[in-house]
Structures are given as structure tokens and as C-alpha cells.
Amino acid sequence: MEKTMSNSTSTPAAHRLGLVGRKVGMTRIFTEEGESIPVTVLDVSNNRVTQIKSLEADGYAAVQVAYGTRRASRVAQPQTGHYAKAGTEAGSILKEFRLDPARLAEFTPGAVIAVESVFEAGQQVDVTGTTIGKGFAGTIKRHHFGSQRASHGNSRSHRVPGSIGQAQDPGRIFPGKRMSGHLGDVTRTVQNLDVVRVDAERGLLLVKGAVPGHAGGDVVVRPAIKAPAKKGA
């Protein structure tokens, strides 16, 4: 029978346990007052501990967790031994979360971390994902430049950025100049999203608003590190 770990102890924001999962998609839920709230559904089920890292052995304290599944034929031999040592099946994602060394005794390799033991409704979280790749894009789409005139002397220069530098002096384009290029497919974190609902039975987390990436993309959910202090606290 699988064991469930708890995250009840208060720790600094930088050393709080998070969960790994995937973005299911967006929907909306209604409050008792009839208010419609747009939410993103995150599947953070079956996060299992694969390794405990200690100060003595590794130089820092952390818990390594795995999420998802992977066919045995797709797992490298060293990873196969790593998962076998933890007594758990191979995952598609491995992620470490730094913790207070005093908390390492709470975790056991092979144990499953329940979503309700880490997050609760009303809490704020930071969600990290990979944005949707949009390929090569011009400056209007990539940097929100304004277009040039549609006519009146403008010929074939309607969407070009204009001047990108000077003449012989300095004779180069300065670093950081906003130009056309690849758009999207980068790691981004959205901070301070409200947890609207926690579905413990299915291992789902419903957060208010949008999350980076497409449906099915990998995400990392952590307690908000910049959560505003409560009034009167």
C-alpha cells in the first residue's frame, strides 16, 4: 500500500515542497454567488519520492520526486537502477525541491506525496511551464512594434522595424536590439495564482487564471515565494 507524506510544517518560502505535473487545460467554475472563475486544471497526481539528498552525502538537502510514466525500453540503465533502488516505477519527469534538513526524516523513497498535503484552497502558488512555441516572428508580433503607413509613399516597408543602427560609427548593431526572431518555447513562471480548488481524489489542482504552455505540457507548482502579507499580520 502506498504511503502519503505530509507538508504541515512551516518552512521558509525558498525551501518549500512543490509538485510536478502537467497542464490538462482550462475551464471555469462557478461560486455559490454565481460568479464565473476561469481556472487552469493541473494534474499533480502520483508524485513519488525517488531520492532523499542530505547535507552529508550531497552537500545540500532536497527531495527528488518523479511524475508520469515511461516505458521500460525508453529508460536508460542507470535510471532503471535509480528507480529500482527507490522501489518505484520510472517517471517521465524528475525534479528536486530544496528543503530544510530537519524535514528530510518526514520522507521515504517510494512514498507518494498527496496534493492535499502540500496545497489547499485559497493558497497562492507559482507555476512554471514552457510557453507555446510560435516559430519565427517579426517585430510587430514579437515585440509589439507599431506598423508603418499603409500607403502615401510607403512601398514594401509596412511591417519592417525601421533603422537598426547607425552608419560607420559605431558600425555595428548594439546588443539587445529588439529584432525579428524565434518567439515562444521558453521557460516562464507565473506568480501568485490563487488555488481555487483541490481535488484530492483525482490529484487535481485548479488555479485561477492562465498557466504557460499548451495542454499536456509539463509544469512545476510551488508555494508562492512573493505572496503578499495578510492585512493585520
Swiss-Prot record:
Keywords: Methylation, Ribonucleoprotein, Ribosomal protein, RNA-binding, rRNA-binding. GO terms for molecular function: rRNA binding; structural constituent of ribosome. Gene3D superfamilies: 3.30.160.810, Translation factors. Methylated by PrmB. Residues 145-172 are annotated as: Disordered. It comes from the Bacteria. The modification N5-methylglutamine is found at Q168. GO terms for cellular component: cytosolic large ribosomal subunit. GO terms for biological process: translation. One of the primary rRNA binding proteins, it binds directly near the 3'-end of the 23S rRNA, where it nucleates assembly of the 50S subunit. Part of the 50S ribosomal subunit. Forms a cluster with proteins L14 and L19. Belongs to the universal ribosomal protein uL3 family. This is Large ribosomal subunit protein uL3.
